[in-house]
Amino acid sequence: MSRIAATFARLAGQGRKALIPYVTAGDPFADITVDLMHAMAKAGADVIELGVPFSDPMADGPVIQRASERALSRNISTADVLAMVARFRETDDTTPVVLMGYANPVERYGPDRFVDDARAAGVDGVLVVDYPPQECEAFADRLRAADLDPIFLLAPTSTDARMADVGRIATGYVYYVSLKGVTGSGNLDTDAVARMIPRIRSHVSVPVGVGFGIRDAATAVAVARVSDAVVIGSRIIQLIENEPRERVVPVAAGFIAEIRTALDTLQGTHA
């Protein structure tokens, strides 16, 4: 059983929901990411999504775009991101890490080499935003052969056919983008999310995480009531992007702990 599957199985047995924070590797300081990952895990993160910086992150709003730009300005490469995961794994061999990014860095690195090096570093899953499921079955097969979970996005505009494609090849979990548009935008319509999740579940057997638009404990709890996991990215980056170095880790950890406490008020409830 993969680390991601084991994590969701453990949480399901406890009647708890997964908390999945996202940060961009190398932001807001090049050498702070591993400390940030450890602090978030200790504060209650169940899975960590680590963004691979890219110059044209088309699905991301201005907050995550700025994070990518800051990381790239410090010359953070895909190899650097993998090295960060390897360092994290030196002292944490239980918290799953998912790399989230775009096709261009994967293609430049070389897909086969990327999979091999991701596995060696201790990565658990890979989400390539602009790899449509029907066009990347070979890559998904390669990931699974390396015991890595191919993770995919679904959106309010996703058709039943796309959901079926994702359900056929995704492992680990699927990430439902709860808003049309880019990350960090708009107001979350939790009723619309609640209506969509059963439709997704009819096509997908893995857990369903929901992200985009989750900014505080109240929205996290509302989403967690109807899903298996809450994904938070833009809000974390907003909180830390202008902090001095010594405040970045405690600010992020404090926010994660607040969300974790709120989610655990739902313990024993089922989506």
Curated annotation (Swiss-Prot):
User: A Pfam family this protein belongs to?
Assistant: Trp_syntA
Any one GO molecular function term: tryptophan synthase activity
EC number(s) stated in the UniProt entry for this protein: 4.2.1.20
Give the enzyme class: lyase
Q: Which reaction does it catalyse?
A: (1S,2R)-1-C-(indol-3-yl)glycerol 3-phosphate + L-serine = D-glyceraldehyde 3-phosphate + L-tryptophan + H2O
Q: Which CDD domains match?
A: Tryptophan_synthase_alpha (cd04724)
From what superkingdom does this record's organism come?
Bacteria
Query: Which of UniProt's keywords are assigned here?
Result: Amino-acid biosynthesis, Aromatic amino acid biosynthesis, Lyase, Tryptophan biosynthesis
Matches recorded under InterPro entries? Aldolase_TIM, RibuloseP-bd_barrel, Trp_synthase_alpha_AS, Trp_synthase_suA
User: Could you tell me which pathway this protein works in?
Assistant: Amino-acid biosynthesis; L-tryptophan biosynthesis; L-tryptophan from chorismate: step 5/5
Quaternary structure and partners: Tetramer of two alpha and two beta chains.
PANTHER family referenced in this protein's UniProt entry, alphabetically: TRYPTOPHAN SYNTHASE ALPHA CHAIN, CHLOROPLASTIC, TRYPTOPHAN SYNTHASE, ALPHA CHAIN
Which function does this protein serve? Answer: The alpha subunit is responsible for the aldol cleavage of indoleglycerol phosphate to indole and glyceraldehyde 3-phosphate.
Its family remark reads: Belongs to the TrpA family.
Q: What is this protein called?
A: Tryptophan synthase alpha chain
